[in-house]
UniProtKB/Swiss-Prot annotation:
GO terms for cellular component: cytoplasm; exodeoxyribonuclease VII complex. Its EC number is 3.1.11.6. This is Exodeoxyribonuclease 7 large subunit. CDD domains: ExoVII_LU_OBF. It catalyses: Exonucleolytic cleavage in either 5'- to 3'- or 3'- to 5'-direction to yield nucleoside 5'-phosphates. One of its GO terms (molecular function) is exodeoxyribonuclease VII activity. It is found in: Cytoplasm. One of its GO terms (biological process) is DNA catabolic process. It comes from Mycolicibacterium paratuberculosis (strain ATCC BAA-968 / K-10) (Mycobacterium paratuberculosis). Bidirectionally degrades single-stranded DNA into large acid-insoluble oligonucleotides, which are then degraded further into small acid-soluble oligonucleotides. Heterooligomer composed of large and small subunits. It holds the Pfam family Exonuc_VII_L.
Length: 415
């Protein structure tokens, strides 16, 4: 049998009964006293026949919630109408109900978070995100000129969805959309928008994502200044266009997104080109190109005409004719000089030939001289001494008109 309290330590052999644990937990929580809590109302259950109102207070940044209860009169006399999405600050005492084992906060005071306070918090978050570099223009991704498919996150059957799709189709009839309808205000908006954003970012066919919502109060647009949503937009690989509210509205998602559009209609104009405008541009470019080509041809024709009008091209043989006489005179002079030089050289060669004939052996032989050569095994040799022609030596005697053979009888006396 187990006991609520024992001197022995708690263990599997000595467990606490449920009532003991519940009473201890209730005691710990009861010692907390009253606490101030801020959150967003996610559910308000106000039954006509009940004096107690049950509500759920949610923390959008952490996706956590807390059950709260309060007297009916406290809700009816609240400074603002309490509804889902209302940001409030409450004072209450934590309670643990031992019978059901549930935790709740019993409220004694409810205060609405004023617009000024909301704006101040948004400004503090803006400074934080700016300091982290989430607004850096260098991180902005370019929007494709003609996206294959456009991801559109907006409220179901909303004017923003109708405006974006109608204007985009009017500008580019072949445009395609992947639409994700989500809550765009209230406690569930941030979670649904972030989920849709991540889903479209994973889709390889989606080239750009448009986040669209019409105008509204600061409270209505509060989800679009949520830190979780801003960081989800910054983490996207797909370019994001923020088209939330109207021109004066400036939620933080506008600063994180790659492109800010003043309205959903403006987003449609930014995301796809205008077919008519592009056709006009093409026609204008073709017209300007044709005119530029015609101007170029005209300039080249004028330049060619100027070149052809020059004397050297108008009468190309004129220069040759002017130089023909000069060439003729030069040719005659060359011929005269060549003839004169040829005659002089011919005469000089004749003189040299005559001198050569006079000094040569043939001229000596013609004057009656003879050349005597010995004939031997080594070939003929000119006889230079009588000692070279002993008796019996064969001789060859060359005269002017030929040669005769002779035989030496040896040296003789006398002349």
């Amino acid at each position: 049998m187990t006991r609520a309290a024992t001197s022995e330590p708690n263990s599997a052999e000595n467990p606490f009964p449920v009532r003991a644990v519940a009473i201890r937990v209730a005691g710990w929580i009861d010692r907390l006293g009253t606490v101030w809590v801020e959150g967003q109302l996610a559910q308000v259950s106000l039954r006509p026949d009940s004096k107690t109102v049950f509500m759920v207070l949610r923390d959008p940044a952490a996706d956590m919630s807390l059950t709260v209860t309060c007297p009916r009169d406290l809700v009816l006399n609240a400074p603002v109408k309490l509804a889902e999405g209302t940001q409030v600050v409450v004072c209450g005492k934590p309670s643990f109900y031992t019978g059901r084992g549930t935790f709740s906060l019993r409220l004694s005071e409810i205060r609405a978070v004023g617009v000024g306070e909301l704006l101040a918090r948004i400004e503090r978050l803006r400074r934080l995100l700016d300091a982290e570099g989430l607004f850096d223009p260098r991180l902005k991704r370019p929007i494709p000129f003609l996206p294959n498919m456009i991801g559109l996150i907006t409220g179901r059957a909303s004017a923003a969805e109708r405006d974006v799709k109608t204007v985009a189709a009017g500008r580019w009839p072949a445009v395609r959309f992947a639409v994700r309808n989500t809550a765009v205000q209230g406690p569930n908006a941030v979670a649904q928008i972030v989920e849709a954003l991540r889903e479209l970012d994973r889709d390889p066919e989606v080239d750009v994502i448009v986040l669209a919502r019409g105008g509204g109060s600061v409270e209505d647009l509060l989800p679009f200044s949520d830190e979780t949503l801003c960081r989800a937009i910054a983490a996207c690989r797909t370019p994001v266009i923020s088209a939330v509210g109207h021109e004066p509205d400036n939620p933080l998602c506008d600063l994180v997104a790659d492109v800010r559009a003043a309205t959903p209609t403006d987003a449609a104009k930014k995301v796809v080109p205008d077919t008519a405008a592009e056709q006009r541009l093409i026609d204008d470019l073709r017209r300007r190109s044709a005119q530029a080509l015609r101007n170029w041809v005209s300039r080249e024709q004028r330049a060619l005409a100027q070149i052809r009008s020059r004397p050297v091209l108008a009468e190309p043989l004129r220069a040759l004719t002017a130089r023909a006489e000069e060439v003729h005179r030069a040719r005659s002079a060359i011929r005269h000089d060549v003839t004169r030089l040829t005659a002089a050289e011919t005469e000089r060669i004749g003189h040299l030939r005559a001198r050569l004939a006079t000094l040569g052996p043939a001229a000596t032989l013609a004057r009656g001289y003879a050349v005597v050569q010995t004939v031997g095994a080594g070939g003929p040799h000119v006889l230079r001494s009588v000692g070279d022609a002993p008796a019996g030596t064969r001789l060859r005697v060359r005269v002017a008109d030929g040669a005769v053979a002779a035989l030496s009888e040896g040296p003789t006396d006398g002349e």
